[in-house]
Amino acid sequence: MNHSPLKTALAYECFQDQDNSTLALPSDQKMKTGTSGRQRVQEQVMMTVKRQKSKSSQSSTLSHSNRGSMYDGLADNYNNYGTTSRSSYFSKFQAGNGSWGYPIYNGTLKREPDNRRFSSYSQMENWSRHYPRGSCATPGAGSDICFMQKIKASRSEPDLYCDPRGTLRKGTLGSKGHKTTQNRCSFYSTCSGQKAVKKCPVRPPSCTSKQDPVYVPPISCNKDLSFGHSRASSKICSEDIECSGLTIPKAVQYLCSQDEKYQAIGAYYIQHTCFQDESAKQQVYQLGGICKLVDLLRSPNQNVQQAAAGALRNLVFRSTPNKLETRRQNGIREAVSLLRRSGSTEIQKQLTGLLWNLSSTDELKEELVADALPVLTDRVIIPFSGWCDGNSNMSREVVDPEVFFNATGCLRNLSSADAGRQTMRNYSGLIDSLMAYVQNCVAASRCDDKSVENCMCILHNLSYRLDAEVPTRYRQLEYNTRNAYTEKSSTGCFSNRGDKMMNNNYDCPLPEEETNPKGSSWLYHSDAIRTYLNLMGKSKKDATLEACAGALQNLTASKGLMSNGMSQLIGIKEKGLPQIARLLQSGNSDVVRSGASLLSNMSRHPVLHRVMGNQVFPEVTRLLTSHTGNTSNSEDILSSACYTVRNLMTSQPQMAKQYFSNSMLNNVFNLCRNTASSPKAAEAARLLLSDMWASKELQSVLRQQGFDRNMMGNIAGANNLRNFTSRF
């Protein structure tokens, strides 16, 4: 079966006129004659050269897909427990030795796995322009080249070379004698891209092997390149170049030419070919082209700078060896240096896209945080957001929306790293600008703006372990409260005040909020909570919804005052339970998981039980009744639902009775027996049924279903049978 050629390098929705994103390709008939990949590229170049003009691009406010991020099971020593299990994703579950308690900390660390990191890719709109001989158009400033210079950003695509990664979940069982509940927090990262063009069949990739290719050490670059200023008299027209004979080796040779025209031509050809052919990336690596392209970032000619940045952007996409080689050749610092001093929008697009691509590799994040974070924040994020602290003398240059989108995509990746997360929290103006942008978009009903998703995912990540890593007013209040309880209980060894502190069953005055929050104080401020809830109520993008719920999930995941205060703020003051409960109806399992985990966290606080009852109980029991369990998130969803029901039913047993249907109880019972494939959900279901049996008001519901002491003993398990029977 012959496939039609790929006729576009960009997502259709990026432009109102699709012609702006097309390459000049041979006819379909020619494509079916079996020409080689190299011949096809050369034919495309020659046909594009003959174009007389190209239409200008439309707005760079690109729409993009609703993909959520995957999970990365990185080792984390949170609470210093943990055993790792792996199914379709990585899972880490912390278990203590509590007899009847369930996890008091079961957090998700959401990071960007390689195969779902969405980073910018670039492709030339028209590889070159044709001008009649002898009548070359006058080039723009800094240009002496007559072919088309404009580069467009194409849809972001996932890395195809790495296996899917999953959640990092951790939890500990409560200490013996105390019934505790699970805490969940989540950690989010990258996913930003646009939908693929469905109207155009895609040519099969030229390199589909998942094995890492063997790379030849790159050739050292000639450091004696000439970077002279462009000369108008040296202009050449594109038809003077023998494009039909251009190859990757010749293009790499062009990079070392002392003529800037040939430098740009070589870089553009590499950029164009690497978009078409994955194997070209390895060839450029072997020929030492990366170091030459990095050197060209220092060229005084803007066309050469733009071409080199675009070529590097495509070279590093999906290629870890090329990313590492770019770093080794000092490419990160050169790119950051050029971004700091360049005022060209097109160059800024290429450089921020390059940095976004590089940021998906963990080995590069530390250097990117150190070098790129200041420039991205000061030159892109703060100016575009419109935020100002009133004392800043920072220049307010106009920033293109696509540059902002690329920059937030890069920071979205960097925020997943532990060191990067803390550095980003402390960087002046970053959180303020991200929050200002999200709030402005919500106020303007632009909740599905593509950059809002990136900003929310950054804020989600920066909220991870906030109570443990950032000094907050809650921590100071909790410290003072603990000292007060310790002094009062020092005369007796049987006081339960310490238990109350651990289980959040105490009343303490919550700290007053800052009138004008700054930096990390924004992350737990009521204005931020209100913004997240408003966004959850208005956005239709699954990734944005998941990020909002994940940020709230992180804020409610601790065992102290912050979780209590945030839960009350969300559920009572801001009346956010309806928005959260609606997440459980989503068709996206990532969204359902985040919503269910957030409700599980909030249900730990008795002060919320009454308000949560009728608003949450119907949706949570519906999950236990109808959830099919056929997704990778099913175990987390079902275990969260069991814990939420368990918490709420103890304080409102009569209300709970009306929602305990036969089908729900049968599903929970079957879940108890499914210990092999869903151990966490089975444990949560077992604890739910055990507490129902222990309740005088609810035991009758189980008896009506045919449950008896022997059956409940079997559910408890042989090891726990003695403890179980002793409770009745």
Swiss-Prot record:
Sequence segments annotated as region (Required for binding to single stranded DNA): 1-235
Organs and tissues of expression: Expressed in undifferentiated keratinocytes of the epidermis at birth, expression increases as differentiation proceeds (at protein level). Expressed in the cervical loop during early tooth differentiation, expression is then present between ameloblasts, at ameloblast-ameloblast junctions and in the stratum intermedium during pre-secretory and secretory stages of tooth development (at protein level).
Disruption outcome: Knockout mice are born at the expected Mendelian rate at a lower birth weight and whiskers are absent. In the hour following birth mice develop skin lesions in the absence of mechanical trauma, and die within 24 hours of birth, average lifespan is 12 hours. Cell-cell separation is apparent in the epidermal granular layer. Skin thickness is reduced in the paw, however normal on the dorsal side of the mice. Reduced number and size of subcutaneous adipocytes in the dorsal epidermis. Desmosome number is reduced by 90% and remaining desmosomes are 45% smaller in the epidermal suprabasal layers.
ARM repeat feature ranges: 244-275, 276-317, 318-360, 361-412, 413-443, 505-536, 537-583, 584-629, 630-694
PTM entry text: Phosphorylated by AKT2; required for interaction with YWHAG and subsequent localization away from desmosomes to the cytoplasm. Phosphorylation of Ser-119 by AKT2 promotes PKP1-driven cap-dependent mRNA translation and decreases intercellular adhesion, phosphorylation is promoted by insulin. Phosphorylation by RIPK4 at the N-terminus is required for its role in differentiation of keratinocytes and DSG1 localization at cell junctions.
Alphabetically ordered keywords of this record: Cell adhesion, Cell junction, Cell membrane, Cytoplasm, DNA-binding, Membrane, Nucleus, Phosphoprotein, Repeat, RNA-binding
Induction: Induced by Ca(2+) in dental epithelial cells.
Keyword Cell membrane assigned: yes
Molecular function via GO: DNA binding; lamin binding; RNA binding
Compartments in which it is found: Nucleus; Cytoplasm, Perinuclear region; Cytoplasm; Cell junction, Desmosome
Region of interest called Required for interaction with EIF4A1, as start-end residue ranges on this chain: 1-287
Any single biological process term in GO: intermediate filament bundle assembly
Protein purpose: A component of desmosome cell-cell junctions which are required for positive regulation of cellular adhesion. Plays a role in desmosome protein expression regulation and localization to the desmosomal plaque, thereby maintaining cell sheet integrity and anchorage of desmosomes to intermediate filaments. Required for localization of DSG3 and YAP1 to the cell membrane in keratinocytes in response to mechanical strain, via the formation of an interaction complex composed of DSG3, YAP1, PKP1 and YWHAG.
Family from the record: Belongs to the beta-catenin family.
Classification via PANTHER family: PLAKOPHILIN-1, PLAKOPHILLIN-RELATED
Protein name: Plakophilin-1
Organism of origin: Mus musculus
Classification lineage: Eukaryota, Metazoa, Chordata, Craniata, Vertebrata
Chain's gene name: Pkp1
